[in-house]
Amino acid sequence: AAIVKSFKDDSNMFCFSLYLNKDFNFSKRYNSPTKLVPLNHDDKTIKWDWHKHYFDFGNPFLLESSVFLKSDFKKLSSKCQFNDIDDLEADLQKFNTFPKFVMSCFKENVKKEDIKETYQP
């Protein structure tokens, strides 16, 4: 229940990344080193301000690996024009000042199978 807990515990929570973790230090997408500066953490997750980060830690709109509240995502995506997932990711970039500033991820890598069994509400 770590994903659900992250959203319930923080009204500024915008996105939970299934891709990132505390050891992620190089962005293949941007071919550049990257660094996480956490706001806080618990035994399973880390939170950070995505507005203050670059590359992957500053981009909640990597849709293949992100979890959002349905209400937030519906609000944003309804204001986008797109034909496919790549178009949607690109158009969502216009919301890079969205007021919910917290992203979160698991501290350690978690297998997809474990997320389905353990963390799905």
Feature-to-residue mapping (PLM):
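Alpha-helical elements of Rossmann-like donor-binding domains used by nucleotide-donor carbohydrate transfer enzymes
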Residues: 2-6, 91-94
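Conserved catalytic core of nucleotide-sugar-dependent glycosyltransferases
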Residues: 3-81
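C-terminal catalytic/acceptor-binding lobe
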Residues: 71-121
